[in-house]
């Protein structure tokens, strides 16, 4: 089920510069964008999303994000109202309309507006999903000072639902985790299971470097299948770095030589402190620093 994306538009010359967003096939100023109060994304968090970075006005890892979007939709038995080619065209048009050099494109697809509140899924033949995209300008995205200073994380219990591999908009607990970190004077939080086993960060995958090996948790329903994670794994192996996919604990992370996170918006960021304890020398290590360099080099080369 698809429909063509609306024809590219130019900014109206008569109005002040305003961010242009995309809603269900239309490009509109953000203050004119509308989604029904009965939309299931709003009422039920019945929606999935993706965030794609933009460097030099081009999209980073778009095919991976599109593939994960398709998987998330399939896992929730949700049909996409747009094709991958249409989504690519919309991403590019929003980048153009909003003059994004470095930043993000946010995409969300919900199960749509059935006309009233109801727990039961609507008939997809009768109710089309809602498609929303917008950009965020982030000058200096690739030059994040945290890459040189490192970030501090705390560990918190992981009480989320069991399908963390589906990228849904159910982000209340991750948001709470970020606020817990902020109140503790840290930058982010790592979720932990019984025994202090790390699952992932609030919006990123978690890694350590120990015994000469790069370690990150293996894919399962327990963690998000990070697109940047996959790219960093591939690039590390291509660089002849030893990689191991397995669980690790907070205690092991504190005793590691290095720790870091990966995500579409952070790329690779070193973790220099966990629960107040320094990791390694307490400053960004050579492995995380090199992986960030390699990832950014490859991303710029392959961007579309």
Q: Where are the predicted features?
A:
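Short beta-strand scaffold segments in enzyme catalytic cores
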Residues: 189-191, 205-208
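Secondary-structure junction motif
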Residues: 228-229
């Amino acid at each position: 089920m698809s429909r063509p994306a609306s024809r590219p538009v130019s900014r109206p010359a008569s109005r002040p510069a305003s961010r242009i967003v995309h809603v269900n096939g239309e490009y509109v100023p953000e203050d004119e964008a509308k989604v029904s109060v009965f939309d299931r994304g709003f009422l039920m968090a019945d929606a999935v999303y993706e965030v794609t970075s933009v460097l030099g006005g081009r999209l980073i890892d778009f095919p991976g994000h599109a593939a994960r979007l398709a998987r998330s939709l399939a896992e929730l038995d949700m049909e996409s109202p747009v094709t991958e080619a249409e989504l690519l065209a919309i991403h590019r048009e929003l980048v153009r309309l909003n003059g994004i050099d470095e930043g993000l494109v946010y995409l969300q697809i919900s199960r749509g507006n059935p006309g009233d509140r109801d727990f039961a899924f609507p008939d997809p033949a009768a109710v089309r999903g809602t498609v929303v995209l917008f950009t965020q300008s982030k000058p200096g995205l690739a030059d994040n000072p945290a890459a040189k200073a490192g970030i501090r994380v705390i560990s918190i219990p992981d009480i989320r639902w069991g399908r963390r591999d589906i990228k849904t908009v159910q982000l209340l607990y991750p948001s709470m985790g970020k606020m817990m970190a902020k109140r503790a004077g840290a930058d982010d939080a790592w979720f932990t299971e019984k025994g202090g086993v790390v699952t992932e960060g609030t919006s990123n995958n978690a890694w350590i470097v120990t015994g000469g090996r790069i370690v990150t948790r293996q894919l399962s329903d327990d963690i998000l299948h990070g697109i940047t994670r996959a790219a960093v794994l591939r690039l590390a192996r291509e660089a002849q770095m030893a990689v191991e996919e397995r669980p690790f604990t907070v205690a092991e992370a504190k005793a590691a030589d290095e720790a870091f996170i990966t995500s579409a918006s952070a790329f690779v960021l070193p973790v220099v402190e966990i629960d107040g304890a320094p990791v390694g020398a307490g400053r960004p290590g050579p492995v995380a620093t090199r992986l960030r360099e390699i990832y950014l080099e490859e991303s710029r080369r392959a961007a579309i």
